[in-house]
A protein has these predicted regions:
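Nucleotidyltransferase catalytic core that binds NTPs
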Residues: 1-103
Length: 103
């Protein structure tokens, strides 16, 4: 990834990654040109059975199959159980594209 280039993030559990997530990725990539996918640590429960590594592998396989280049078009970063986003600057654009009605 070009660390100077405009980037957007996708934050979630992605348990599992599915077509609506891929659609969200396509939209984010179209709008910003590169995406950091932040995988919330949520391993080992009945609701969240997949490990970060399993989810990351599946996401990479899916997006590469779609024609995106890992480490150039997108990267994956494990993160703790983030429950809120805070920003002290108005220079950051906060957008919300919901896919909850499909889950």
């Amino acid at each position: 990834m070009d660390w100077q280039k405009r980037t957007t993030q996708m934050l979630g559990r992605f348990q599992p990654w599915h077509e609506r997530h891929t659609e969200l990725f396509r939209s984010a990539f179209h709008d910003y040109g590169q995406v950091i996918i932040m995988l919330i640590e949520s391993d080992g429960t009945a609701k969240n059975p997949l490990s970060v590594d399993q989810r990351a592998s599946f996401i990479v396989e899916t997006l590469v199959r779609e024609g995106y280049v890992y480490k150039t078009d997108f990267e994956i970063m494990p993160v703790p159980n983030i429950v809120a986003l805070s920003s002290g600057k108005t220079t950051y654009k906060m957008t919300h594209k919901s896919i909850e009605d499909e889950e």
